[in-house]
């Protein structure tokens, strides 16, 4: 019999952490190896089953001791903040385990540190773990390649009022897909935060607009607009469990893989 994949969850008391704990508990072939919370969290010492609303306690308490948990795990699923993710990446690299990164908001220097960690660990990193969004990215890439420069590209995203970064990681993922389709670097054509008298739209730009409010899980729309017509591609996330399920799929996929930096497109086999 194949042993269960032992998974550590970061941000165990958060919305994604609790969802992951519930799904791991329900899924055959997976076992919960522990849950991490930051120093000073009021949830430290709380049973993970209690945090996730399970009928029975798990016997595992939320802890800040990442080293102890990670060294005995098979995978780390990480929806946290960039500073914490960089620390976890170093530990995952030392332990040679699968590190699934759903954290967003990284700076360029952070991305370089993650690439360095991927020389020793299997890292699956994505701005969005859902099948639907990754299929959308493939469609956006194809559309951007097929349509000429007369078509303007704008990306609009909306999330709940508590989200702290903008544009969302998913919006950037879609922007990267559009830029790849056009054969350009996103950082060279990205247009964000338009306000006041900005002048006419620059040809070739990929624009971003971010909305925040309510409890929206995630809405993303990519608009291709030219004279007299418009193409709209989009995705609506109705339940954050889609991201958790994708992360668990990535953790399974990464078992037995060598070191490297992978995406959900790799996991899902999407070109």
Curated annotation (Swiss-Prot):
Coiled coil: none annotated. It is an enzyme of class 1 (oxidoreductase). The keyword NAD applies. One of its GO terms (cellular component) is cytosol. InterPro entries: DapB_C (IPR022663), DapB_N (IPR000846), DapB_N_CS (IPR022664), DHDPR_bac (IPR023940), NAD(P)-bd_dom_sf (IPR036291). Its EC number is 1.17.1.8. The active site is at residues 159, 163. The keyword Nucleotide-binding does not apply. GO terms for biological process: diaminopimelate biosynthetic process; lysine biosynthetic process via diaminopimelate. CDD domains: DHDPR_N (cd02274). It is found in: Cytoplasm. It catalyses: (S)-2,3,4,5-tetrahydrodipicolinate + NAD(+) + H2O = (2S,4S)-4-hydroxy-2,3,4,5-tetrahydrodipicolinate + NADH + H(+); (S)-2,3,4,5-tetrahydrodipicolinate + NADP(+) + H2O = (2S,4S)-4-hydroxy-2,3,4,5-tetrahydrodipicolinate + NADPH + H(+). Its main location: cytoplasm. NAD(+) binds at residues 11-16, 37, 102-104, 126-129. Keywords: Amino-acid biosynthesis, Cytoplasm, Diaminopimelate biosynthesis, Lysine biosynthesis, NAD, NADP, Oxidoreductase. Belongs to the DapB family. Catalyzes the conversion of 4-hydroxy-tetrahydrodipicolinate (HTPA) to tetrahydrodipicolinate. NCBIfam families: dapB. HAMAP family: DapB (MF_00102). This is 4-hydroxy-tetrahydrodipicolinate reductase. The gene is dapB.
């Amino acid at each position: 019999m194949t042993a269960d994949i032992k998974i550590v969850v970061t941000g165990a008391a958060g919305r994604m952490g609790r969802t992951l704990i519930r799904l791991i508990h329900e899924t055959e072939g997976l076992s919960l190896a522990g849950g991490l919370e930051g120093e000073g969290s009021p949830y430290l010492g709380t049973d993970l089953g209690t945090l996730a609303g399970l009928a029975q306690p798990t016997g595992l308490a939320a802890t800040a001791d990442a080293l102890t948990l990670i060294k005995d795990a098979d995978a780390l699923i990480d929806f946290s903040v960039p500073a914490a993710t960089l620390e976890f990446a170093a530990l995952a690299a030392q332990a040679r385990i699968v590190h699934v990164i759903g954290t967003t908001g990284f700076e360029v220097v952070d991305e370089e540190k993650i690439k360095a960690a991927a020389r020793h660990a299997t890292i699956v990193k994505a701005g969005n773990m859902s099948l639907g969004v990754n299929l959308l990215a493939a469609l956006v890439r194809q559309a951007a390649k097929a349509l000429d420069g007369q078509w303007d590209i704008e990306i609009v995203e909306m999330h709940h009022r508590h989200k702290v970064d903008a544009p969302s990681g998913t919006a950037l993922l879609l922007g990267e897909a559009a830029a790849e389709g056009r054969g350009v670097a996103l950082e060279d054509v990205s247009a964000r935060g338009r306000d006041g008298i900005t002048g006419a739209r620059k040809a070739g730009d990929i624009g971003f607009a971010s909305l925040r409010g309510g409890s929206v899980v995630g809405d993303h729309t990519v608009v291709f607009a030219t004279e007299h017509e418009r193409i709209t591609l989009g995705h609506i996330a109705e339940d954050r469990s889609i991201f958790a399920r994708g992360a668990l799929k990535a953790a399974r996929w990464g078992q037995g893989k060598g070191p490297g930096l992978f995406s959900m497109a790799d996991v899902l086999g999407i070109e």
